[in-house]
Amino acid sequence: MIFKSFLLGNLGSLYIKIINSVVVVGLYYGFLTTFSIGPSYFFLLRARIMEEGTEREVSATTGFITGQLMMFISIYYAPLHLALGRPHTITVLVIPYLLFHFFSNNQKQFFDYGSTTRNSMRNLSIQCVFLTNLIFQLFNHLMLPSSTLARLVNIYMFRCNNKMLFVTSSFVGWLIGHILFMKWVGLVVSWIRQNHSIRSNVLIRSNKYLGLKLKSAIAQILSIIFFIACVNYLARLPDPSVTKKLNETSKTETEEEESKESQKSKESEEERDVEKETTSETKETKQEQEGSTEQDPSPYWEEKEDPDKIDETEEIRVNGKEKKKDETEEIRVNGKEKKKDEFRFHFKETDYKRSPGYENSYLDGYQDNWDLQSEEEEEEESTLGFEKPLVTCLFDYKRWNRPFRYIKNKTFENAIRDEMSQYFFYTCLNNGKKKISFTYPPSLATFSEIIERKMSLYTTKKLTDDDLYSHWVSNNEEKKNNLSNELINRIKVLDKGSLAPDVLEKRTRLCDDENEQECLPKKYDPLLNGSYRGRIKKLESESTRNDSIISAKGSLEKIWKNKIHSLITNDSREFEHQMDPFDGESLSAYMTHSLTSISKLSLELVSIFHFEDLALLTEQKRIDFENQTKRLKFLFDVITADANNQTIENKFIEIEKIDKKIPRWVYKLISEEDYLAQQEQQEEENEEEAPLDFGIRSRKGRRVVIYTDKNQNRDQDPNPNTDNTTTENDNSDTGEEIALIRYAQQSDFSRDLINGSIRAKRRKIVLWEMLQANAHSPLFLDQVAKMVSFDLFDDLRETMNLIFRNWITKEPELQILDSEEKEDREKLIKIREEDERIIISETWDNVMCAQAIRGCMLVTHSFIRKYIILPLLIIAKNIGRILLFQLSEWDEDFKDWNREMHVKCTYNGVQLSETEFPQNWLKDGIQIKILFPFSLKPWRESKATPSTGGLMKEKKRKNDDFCFLTVWGMEAELPFGPPRNRPSFFKPIFEELDTNIRKVENQSFVFKEKTKDFLKKKTGWVTKIVLLKNKIRNFFTKVNPNLLFGLKKVYEPSENQKDSIISNKITHESTVQIPSSNWTNYSPIEKKMKDLSDRTITTRSQIERITKDKQKGFLTSDINIRSNETSCNAKRTELQKDILRIAKKRSIRFIRKLHSFVKSFIERIYLDIFLCTINIPRINLQLFFESIKKILNKSISNDERNKEKIDETNQNTIHFISTIRNSFSNSNLNNKSKIYWDFSLLSQAYVLYKLSQTQVIKRYQLKSVLQYHRAYPFLKDRIKDLFGTPRIVHAKSRPKKLPISRINAWKNWLRGHYQYNLSQTRWSELVPKKWREKFNQRTIKNKYSRKLNSSEKEKNQQAHYAKEISYVVDSLSSQKGKLKKDYRYDLLSHKYINSNYEDREYSDISRLSLQINGDREIPYDYNRQESDYVLVGLPISDYLGEEYFIGVDKNSDRKYFDRRILRFDLRKDLNIKTQINRDTETNMNKNGTNNYPAIGKKNPFSLPIHQEINSSKKKKQKFFDWMGMREEILYRPISNLEPWFFPEFVLRYDAYKSKPRIISIKSLLLDSQKDERNEIISKTKNINKKNQKKDLSNQKKHLEVENQEKEDFRQVDLRPNPTNQRDPIVSDTRNQQKDIEEDSVGSGVKKRRKKKKFKSKKEAELDFFLKKYLLFQLRWDELLNKKMMTNIKVYCLLLRLKNLKEIAISSIERGEMCLDLMLMQKDLSLRELIKKGIFIIEPIRLSRKWDGKLIMYQTIGISLVAENKDPINIRCRKKGYADENSFNKSVRQQEKMLVDRDENDYDLLVPENILSPRRRRELRILICFNSGNESAVDGNSVFYNNKNVESCRQFLDEDKHLDTDAKKFMKLKFFLWPNYRLEDLACMNRYWFDTTNGSRFSMLRIHMYPRFLISWW
């Protein structure tokens, strides 16, 4: 049984233990390190391959294994690791040994001394082999696969507890792998040696010494490989002797800069965060040290980087006196003058570099600023005579060696050192045990080491790991017990009847004084967080920082209130001290210096105390002032005394932060641009000092001078070569130079790097091209190859199509090509050509002496072309014309030749002149541009009227007016572009000859055709003559009476013969082949040729047939004559044969023509039928609909109630769809319908009276109807029953069945209030038809649009487009009969449904699916009878504003977006009045008419239900309200953008971002009221003080008048309780009045400030724009940039010419010079600049500010379903009402309450809520994560028990409606919260580490709870 249990039960566990054991893991990782091949493998293999002997093999193997053993030992032994891991050590080992190695190879005889025996180990060469393998094993691993395998052992060391066993086992594993590898190598070598086929080579046999030569060659090859490997390794650090030295900033300069910065910081006011922890100074030190890991410190840290900065002219002495010096601040110490910096402490390398992780610490970064050394070190340096240590000179750690980029800060002069790694390994306590953390703050590690070193005097015994863990467990238990007892005590007090507020734990507050018990205000309390915290101004005045208090008692106790400071202050130094009488000024200066030095405690961490001193000082009663000055220089409270022994103590009012110094580089580097700027500035100021040399590599560029403005001798010096860096006293000779910088268009990977640093090693990036913009790894070459192969395939396909095009039988004439694909191909071709040009230019620029060669070739070709080739061609041409007896063209040709100009240009194409060469053109390059290039023509064209072809040629000629000369004398359109085809001289000659030949051919062809026609006519005449003869012959045969019977018999065949002849004639006309209807494959010329050939064939056949018939006719006539002699039977048989022959011939002809006849006949029938079907019904329908429409229009025009202005539609057009739609929609106006059912006749008072009398309708019946978000078919029946039963209409007049229009009334009403689809009556009355037509041109078809007839669309597309617009307009104006009454019934019915709000049972009927903005929330004011519900005509802008805000969830009811709502260009002078607005309602006076109050501002987005256009009144409008945005919108999910730049863009921008393809981006900026707004801006900028006061008074008077009018208006109100209702308009006017008063107050404040005065309107707008560019960015257009550069190039040429007319006109015609850019107006506004395309504004994508709780939930990983994150209105939240849509959405704590809650309800259902949140979290963590049980940390069974989840489900299944009971819901909430403590998990980091830094949050092993299994949560 035991054996079975061992086999079955424990076999798996035993296997797992063996696998996870340290020995097995070490063997595995050690074996893997074998595959990491290093440089030493070369020597190991060399000893075996070269057959150097057994001793060499043994020594090589021994050295190799010894070196590897040393590497493994260095992993465990830190000193050896530091010795072998430092680059200094490796460099010292490599450089001497390389020389020794090569010397030993060359001088082998020198090393072969001693015994001559081969087996002797005394041979020095064998020892060198051992040493070589030993040393090179210590180097980094070089070859396959990577050094990661060698570092696997180091990585696993952090996870292993038994490290020594792991190192030993890993070495054994490596040894096993090495033995196997060497065995394999030995087998391969022996196989090669034994294989005779390899060794027995003919060459080897013929040469005896070839083997020896081969061995020596292999040795040399291995030496070369070894040398390359070593050099590659040494490339890590550049040679210090070759490296360029950087400019080091002197100490005096840095002090001066620091003092200037300190003065600036004192003068400026800065904000600082007042959150400070008051627990301990150690805690603050840790936090500040942790904050040091940031790479880019904030400006706050930058300004406080050296708090002890004082004026440099100030001198402080310890005795209290103050003297002034000129340069530096000095302190007398032991009779020596030393600088202030020498009193700073400095870390010694020998003291604090013991830890393994020190090499990555921040101490290296601080050493550049810790400039002080000890006195002993300074003396040694002075004796040796070196300014710096030798190691520092050779290996300067302060300079840049790695390829870092210089990050310059505006505040700091020197760059900040941010090269330290983010990983720092150090031991820390975690759960009471020491563990290695790789993100430990290095500054905190340094601080702890200092504290431990100083505390070693106090503590003699260190705690073990077990003691630390037990101590941690006991502390946690004690904390848990204390918290539990406190909670129990509070519960007991609560049970006794105490009040809950007294029992609850209060929030900890910070008090000023213990006696008075007064706490700091919430704004300044550092213990508070959240909304109570604020930011205060920090004043640097001395009065607020310190306070002098004189006291003679209690000074000793107050000295030692900071004991940590006593451990980290400076070392004890001997000071000379002299007592002087008390001096207040010296004391204040001394205290200032001491106070400012306190903030450097984190850096100046050196103690001055010893344990014996502390024991003595505690026993002293009187302090000796001399000892105090020696030891208490930097105490927390600095104490001094006067002669009267009165102690003066400096007391802090607030706690000073412990700051640290930011590590900065000593070297002050400048870029090349800064260097040139400083150089020019010094030249202007005539300073002799040369600027510092630039140390930063800039982009490769060359300065090209394009123009030199000289006042004198300008024409005498055509080739100026002035130097920019020198200035002369004679200003007449030198002038201002205008230069451009030409950058190299190639890859510049060394840009912004520091001179002297090595280049970045890109092992995986290969550059194989001259110009490679996107350098990538060779791994992606396959993708590039695929792209190239695709391109090659496309080119091959095109060539194949060209070759085999003639082989294709049928090719369509029109080939449809994809335009987008064509454009893409053209773009690719342009890009390729551009890349080729750049490659060629950079090749010429990079090759040595290439520019000089190219320039000389260009100049030579230019001279040969201008003065040799072209004149010879002109002479040859004119001589040829004279020989051909034509007029010569000497004058014209030489005139064009003189017009050609060869302009010298710079390398990038900037034109200079014909005679002026650019500076340094042999070095920088040159281009030659040919203007008006001469082209030789055989003859001159006549100056006739230009045709279309002539215009094209003229345009092409203008484009060919310039070119660039290539190296080979060709012409190119662009520099380095492909040579273009020059116009051929002989091409027009050959074309002229070709045209003449074609003319001759055409004439001959015409002659042939005419001859054919003539012959055809002649043959026709011949046939007519033959027929006439036959007729005469037949006539004479009829006259003979004897032959009457025979003739009768013979007559029939003669008739048949005649018919045959006639049929032959008919055949002559019909034998012409009918051309095929498929003529698309033939061109017109081919058709003509084919017809002519057919005609010739037919004529020839007809002639042959006629000749045959002639012969046949004569033969038959003979037979007929001789037939008198024959019998009748013979005649009959002959006649039958003739009949059969004729019948056969006709049948053949009929069969042959039958197919074409049937086809043509059917086509003609189909065509006729189609035309009939189209025309006849169309005409009938047209007449029918026109008659119906006339009747309807007549009935509508008779209606007196329709007084609105509706444009008449065109009566002549055919309205198919609109007429049908109007007929159905206006069916209620039919004559058959009774007048009682026209609801427009019912008055509002009557309907109100009938509704008030009915008791049938109940609101709960409409609850389900209104809660539905979709229009189901059964809704209309429900609404019909509800509103049909109250008998609003008389029973007598009501029919049995309602008409269709009345049944659909409520459905149309619901649809009319849909967000984006207005009803037809609303749409018809908005704006006149002109605007509708203009607007609908940009609209899209929505889901209700209809399609027109396809035939109409094909006939005329423009007419169809105009008809479609009119149809949409007509469809919107269908419900004309209810134009005024429809809205009133909607309002009345909704009022009635929502009346009597006292009953709160059905108060959750809040709204329909229409979502509105925050300012439109339903107030739930039950005392108000008039409410602000959504069915009263809210503007569409509200819906647009909420729907298009970023982050707001879209409404589920919105299915389609109709762009007709967005009316962006409706900016005319219209004062739109709306009937119903936000807080106004319909008012009824005595006469029954309605008065509608007007809105105070225009709203173009507001498309309300009823609008009246009144153009008589014009109201001024503010600039910031030109979009008509609503200023009362309370909630915006994006951010409040109104104070930002251009708030009018916000609403449009949100709409555009949601639908960018529908809305044009131009609509964001277009506005027709430009001039008006510009005037308003200019007026507001220039208003003086008097006008402001007058305007304010006028505005107040105007508001008072409006308020009086509104009060009069309210008097006629018929509402029941008008006094209980607030008037929103009055409140709005009060708000306006308040704003005006605030503006007046603010204007008084602004008077005191110095305001910048702008000279022009443009400056004011641009200044405002640049200040508010946070939302929009400004950039130049790329096209505009090109235009500007081309203009500059033309200007450079024009400035050098005397006659500018011809060149200027030519450049304007070519488009090189843009006149719009030349005529830049000075007073252009920003809007005009945008319109002209000079500036382009692009919106920046707004970032959303996430909720902090939401980030916490996402970080932990449990995402809550949050469909809508909009908070409920505050006033609604208090009463507990919410939107009904929120029932299916997530609930966030303290944001939304689904139920009512009492203000006195303290949520005490959970007892732990008595404690504060911080103490509560602490208690939960201590209980859940039991510190005494380790298994509880790894997995808590309580939270992983499935039974708990089931119990949760059972609990929820008890009642599905938990929201109805507040207590049940609170129970549920607090039941779920302990199981899902998300906040507790997130706060664990803060609790355990006692810090707010969350950088190590991801390092915690958080065990997540299972997800809750209920779907609705």
Curated annotation (Swiss-Prot):
InterPro entries: TIC214
Cleavable signal peptide: none
UniProt cross-references to Pfam families, sorted A to Z: Ycf1
The protein's role, per its UniProt record: Involved in protein precursor import into chloroplasts. May be part of an intermediate translocation complex acting as a protein-conducting channel at the inner envelope.
GO CC annotation terms, alphabetical: chloroplast inner membrane
Biased composition (Basic and acidic residues): 260-289, 315-330
Keywords from the UniProt entry: Chloroplast, Membrane, Plastid, Plastid inner membrane, Protein transport, Transmembrane, Transmembrane helix, Transport
Cellular location(s): Plastid, Chloroplast inner membrane
Protein family membership: Belongs to the TIC214 family.
The protein, known as: Protein TIC 214
UniProt KW Chloroplast keyword: yes
Spans traversing the lipid bilayer: 18-38, 58-80, 84-103, 124-144, 172-192, 214-234
Gene that this sequence comes from: TIC214
Bias kind Acidic residues: ranges: 303-314
Compositionally biased residues, Low complexity: 718-729
Principal cellular location given in the protein's record: plastid
Recorded superkingdom: Eukaryota
One GO BP annotation of this record: protein transport
Keyword Signal recorded: no
Membrane topology: Multi-pass membrane protein
Subunit structure: Part of the Tic complex.
Region of interest (Disordered), residue spans: 245-330, 707-734, 1605-1652
